Amino acid sequence: MKSLVFCSVLLICGVLSAQNKDVFQSVNELVKETQRVISIEKGQVIDTAYFRTLFLPTAHFSMVGQEDGEFMQETMGLDEFLATLTDEYYSNGYHEAGMGAIVEEYNGMAQVIQSFEGMDSENETGKGVNSFQFVYSEGRWWIANMVWAMSYDNGKDIPRKYLKKN
């Protein structure tokens, strides 16, 4: 019986490992995985250890927005960003999903510009645009940087080309 349980556990771990490896072979799947990991229900926590594996250790995260009519940006490194994901703000849940995207790839580098919609822990909904930059190294895709901006009129200002499904 013990050997049956042990074999079952090994099989399950092997399947999960294979599924996770597939995520790193496609920039589209890597974007979806990023959003899957940060989308949590009330009472859940984001798996920041796994989230870290999606990104280069040197990745940067930048949010662009307007304040008093002036464009502003805030940029942080991977460790700083992971710390924000453990904030109490997320304790009531968070959800983000892609609406459409443009994917460009060349010679080991790629970019995905994606429109998204989300709902935060306070049930506020919003739409915006993410820009992911990728590099292919060590047999897989890595997210090198991520930049995002929120829409100011519930997505009506998002260019149509970013709303088209791949």
Task: Name what the model sees in each region.
Residues 1-24:
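Bacterial Sec-dependent N-terminal signal peptides
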Residues 18-53, 163-165:
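Short, low-complexity N-terminal intrinsically disordered segments enriched in polar/charged residues
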Residues 23, 61, 65, 70-121:
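Surface-exposed, charged secondary-structure patches
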Residues 34, 51, 59, 112, ...:
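Hydrophobic pocket/interface hotspot
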Residues 38, 55, 116-118, 147-148:
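Short beta-strand segments enriched in hydrophobic/aromatic residues
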Residues 42-71:
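N-terminal, post-signal-peptide region of Sec/Tat-exported proteins
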Residues 129-155:
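Short beta-strand edge/turn micro-motifs at domain boundaries
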Residues 152-166:
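Short, low-complexity, Pro/Ser/Thr/Gly-rich segments in the mature regions of secreted, periplasmic
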